[in-house]
Amino acid sequence: MRRKLVIAVIMAVLGSAFSASVSNASQVEISATSVKPIELKQINSKLRIVSLANGAAEILNSLGLRNSIVGRDIASTTPELKAIPIVTSGHQVIAEKVISLKPSLVIIDASIGPKSAIDSIKKAKIKVASIPEAWNLQDIQKKVLAIGKLVNENSQARNLNGLMQKATIQSKSNLGWQPKVVFLYLRGPSSIYLIGGPGSGADSLVGALGGVDVGAKTLKTPFNTLTSEALIAANPDVFLVMSKGLQSVGGVSGFLKLPGVAQTNAGKTKRILSVDDSLLLSFGPRTPALLTKMSEALKAMK
């Protein structure tokens, strides 16, 4: 449900990546183009894979199986995957497109639908396999191993996990302070304003960097309706948002006009960390590099 909530809205607004920018020490943007995935050498495989599960295409690419991917979901936007056909409309699978590609394997997760499309693919005698979703740093390794098992590349999966684990450890450094962070999910035109709580995904990133996700400490569910009272009570030092979300409310100036924002420490100091929509909660081969960028940004905001 969480994945459907986030991705369904992201699909409508994903666009080209922005260059990384720092307007001043308090406002930092991390773009998709500024973060590189960890990749293994490309290998030959006879598999024909349609990757529909969130982040699966990116992991397959990093396992060295880019040439085996014959179809992908619209959320897989990294440059390496650009030439691969999209087989979804928004977040809805188009069964006819999938079947026409004659895949030997279709990878899905719990968020993929509609069920009728998946059933049609199965009726066409095509293997459909479901993998676990990743909502925190610990889930990444399980997801990579699950995909590695499906494609008979267990050794490659273990190697990739080892490289990512090493890079994740190296990404962490002393921030020099323990910032209180609030993650806001914003979609202005759709009037969607949510504050992240425990299990939003952002809490795992913030905690790994040595910060405190205030929403995760004080709220009960992954995503909660944003209120001025909740923001003022949380009183974060830094706001974490998605880049398109920030744009959707009119950029920094519009963001500061949202109820309660200007009354917080983060609002007063304009400490806003924005991250590309396809990157922030991707939890995959780009995550270690993302953590490095986030660490650098939070240090600069001290």
Q: At which residue positions do the language-model features occur?
A:
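A short, structured surface patch at a secondary-structure boundary
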Residues: L47-L101, L105-I112, G211-V214, Q247
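Structured C-terminal subdomain patch of bacterial secreted/periplasmic proteins
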Residues: I30, L47, D139-N152, R158, ...
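His/Asp/Glu-enriched short active-site or ligand-binding loop at hydrolase and phosphoryl-transfer sites
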Residues: D73, P198-F223, S243, S274
